[in-house]
Regions:
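Low-complexity, intrinsically disordered segments with a bias for serine/threonine
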Residues: 10, 22-23
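Bacterial N-terminal signal peptides that target proteins for export
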Residues: 1-9
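N-terminal compositionally biased, intrinsically disordered segments and leader/signal-like regions
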Residues: 5, 19, 32-33
Length: 284
């Protein structure tokens, strides 16, 4: 499983409230950055002794300075990707936009009140709208796999604190058989933490979210605060390793226009089958 991270899960799961929720509703914009390093990048950045060890010490990986990583990311053929996403939140609506290359050529709008997901491509003047029924149809086309036995996850406090982007954060470590994560959480974003259970419930009801391990990771972290910085080291047996850094760079509370969450009326609406063909690399 590719570890998507509790920050991403938190944002997608945790920013909407039903009309009966008691927590203060968040409205505003959250800006995030995700940096992913592959084997080649790690070999360029780590000391030779660390690379020659039978198993790379994740602490050496987590200690790599961000400025060195970003400097290397600016060079060609470096095995590093830097993606940024902007999450705009209003009530039960969520708009996701950003720079993630070919993976997201436009933006997405999730309306949990209406129970719809829209993937919008302005360059082509089109969008795809999916409902819970569409997600169920898509999932029925994928063969079910046997559930894997996984170790019980626990969030272990590391007793470390530091300021990250103006927020006071504490560190917690979570380890599975395939990855280890150190997540820095803050208690200063309580309205985001209070909301995540409702959004998770809405996503699961729509059939959009079934990564139970990511859900469990965020639930463990949310007991202590909202994740601001997450460092994850993944190992793939003989197939190498990967290092992911996901960071909340800015949280801005402000009123947002309803137009931001509406698809232009002249855009063409495509079918689910058109979406599946696009995912398979076929043009319309």
């Amino acid at each position: 499983m590719k570890h998507t991270g509790s920050i991403a899960a938190a944002i997608v799961m945790g920013l909407g409230l039903s009309s009966g929720a008691v927590a203060q509703e968040f409205e505003g914009v959250i800006t995030t950055r995700q940096v992913t390093l592959g084997d080649r990048a790690l070999s360029m950045l780590l000391d030779p002794d660390a690379l020659e060890a039978e198993r790379i010490d994740y602490r050496a990986v987590f200690a790599l300075p961000m400025d060195r990583i970003l400097e290397l990311a600016g060079q060609s053929n470096n095995d590093i990707s830097v993606d940024s996403l902007v999450y705009s939140v209003k009530g039960t609506q969520l708009r996701v936009s950003g720079d993630v290359g070919d993976e997201m050529p436009g933006y997405a709008i999730l309306d949990f009140g209406a129970g719809t997901f829209q993937l919008v491509q302005p360059a082509k003047g089109m969008y795809i709208e999916l409902t819970r029924e569409d997600f169920e149809t898509y999932k029925s086309m994928i063969p079910e796999s046997e559930p894997e036995a996984k170790r019980s996850l626990q969030a272990r406090p590391l007793g470390q604190t530091k300021q990250i982007n103006g927020l006071e954060c504490s560190a917690y470590e979570i380890e599975s058989d395939e990855w280890i994560t150190v997540t820095w959480v803050t208690t200063e974003l309580g309205d985001l933490v209070d909301a995540f259970v409702e959004f998770e419930s809405r996503m699961k009801a729509m059939g959009m979210y079934d990564e139970e391990e990511d859900s469990e990771v965020f639930s463990l972290v949310a007991e202590h605060g909202f994740p601001v910085l997450e460092q994850t080291f993944l190992t793939f047996g003989d197939y190498g390793a990967e290092y992911e850094i996901t960071e909340i760079q800015n949280v801005e509370r402000r009123s947002l226009s309803a137009d931001l969450f509406a698809v232009p009326s002249d855009y063409e609406k495509l079918s689910v089958m058109e979406m599946l063909r696009m995912m398979g690399g076929q043009e319309k």
